[in-house]
A protein has these predicted regions:
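Short, solvent-exposed aromatic-acidic interface loops
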Residues: 231-242
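Active-site glycine-centered loops adjacent to acidic/histidine catalytic or metal-binding residues
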Residues: 27-28, 121, 168-169
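Extended active-site neighborhood of metal-dependent phosphoesterases/phosphodiesterases
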Residues: 5-105, 110, 153-161, 172, ...
Length: 243
């Protein structure tokens, strides 16, 4: 999460210089309610329109990128949208219907030998850490069941693989598999105080001026093994995802 400001686009442009290619997704603190919020994020990621291979609907906060040689599609979803209430846009935790149609009718129309990896800040299920029945029946994410249903239907119809849905928001590490799809939660908490959260995720102690000050993963997809290797730099441990 990065609280939005009119200078956020400049921050992201500098990030692309240091990392080569940079594909952000909107977090809940990037999507705070207010008179300008609905347009701040699309403006901030406007630099993506000049990136080769990025397919983004005009002024939308979601997009995809192909690694065509490897037959891999990276899908970057937005788990927040806005509704006008009282004359101002209000942030909604969920997936707007236009995004679901875009996902179902364009993004997930793929040959069977392709592999899809999805990225979003929040998951499609608010009860992600529970069983499949609870995830569907106790879901507070607006259109969460619908976007997952679109994904599941396309997977069955076209036969492509889903290597994982990568999310943040929970502040800790955890891998959950629901309906045959791995959901990979990556830690981001800067202070070791798990009592702040009731979720069953792993938090890591972090200290300034030590290796644990860092916390990020290098991701390696091995299609032949049907595995994703996550190499942790800084606080935490390496992980392996089977799909």
């Amino acid at each position: 999460d990065v609280a939005p400001s009119r200078g956020l686009g400049d921050v992201y442009k500098r990030q692309t210089v240091s990392s080569g290619r940079f594909f952000p997704v909107q977090g809940n603190h990037d999507a705070c309610s207010g008179p300008y919020s609905a347009r701040l994020w699309p403006e901030a990621i406007g630099f993506l329109d000049a990136e080769q291979g990025v397919c983004r609907p005009a002024q939308k906060p979601y997009y995809y990128v192909d690694i065509a040689k490897e037959k891999v599609r990276l899908v970057f979803l937005c788990s927040y949208f806005y509704e006008h209430r009282g004359g101002e846009p209000v942030m909604i935790f969920g997936y707007e219907e236009d995004q679901i149609q875009w996902l179902q009718n364009e993004v997930l129309v793929l040959p069977a030998d392709w592999t899809v990896m999805l990225f979003s800040h929040d998951a499609p299920f608010s009860a992600l850490l529970f069983d499949e029945k609870t995830a569907l029946e106790k879901n507070d994410i607006v259109n969460g069941n619908q976007i997952f249903s679109a994904l599941d239907q396309c997977r069955k119809q076209y036969g492509f693989d889903i290597a994982g849905w990568f999310i943040g928001h929970y502040h800790g590490d955890r891998i959950v598999t629901l309906f045959g799809i791995p959901f990979i939660i990556t830690a981001s908490e800067t202070a070791y105080d798990p009592q702040l959260f009731d979720d069953d995720v792993r938090f890591w102690e972090r200290d300034l001026d030590t290796q644990s000050e860092d916390l990020w993963d290098a991701l390696v997809l091995k299609k032949s093994e049907r595995r994703v290797y996550l190499k942790r730099f800084g606080a935490g441990e390496d992980r392996i995802v089977h799909y």
